[in-house]
Amino acid sequence: MVVIRLSRGGSKARPFYNIVAADKRVRRDGSFIERLGFYNPNARGGEEGLRVALDRVNYWKGVGAQASETAERLIKQATQKTAA
């Protein structure tokens, strides 16, 4: 089963997350099928904090992928940002 979830990167005390489509059986930071965007919780000033390829997210959901709660929240946030 394919899931859309966050994969942690960055360094200690400076997290950075990739939003990825991955097989449910693979570990959190392991291999993934496709990178769908990123989330930087420590974005400051003019830095981009969130980017999501909504067309690819819709494709993966269309073929049965399920998003984690946090990924779903970020996707909704990106959708509202795009609509505004």
Swiss-Prot record:
NCBIfam families: S16. The gene is rpsP. Keywords: Ribonucleoprotein, Ribosomal protein. InterPro entries: Ribosomal_bS16, Ribosomal_bS16_dom_sf. PANTHER family: 30S RIBOSOMAL PROTEIN S16, SMALL RIBOSOMAL SUBUNIT PROTEIN BS16M. This is Small ribosomal subunit protein bS16. GO terms for biological process: translation. Belongs to the bacterial ribosomal protein bS16 family. GO terms for cellular component: cytoplasm; small ribosomal subunit. Transmembrane segments: none annotated. Pfam families: Ribosomal_S16. Gene3D superfamilies: 3.30.1320.10. It comes from Delftia acidovorans (strain DSM 14801 / SPH-1). One of its GO terms (molecular function) is structural constituent of ribosome.
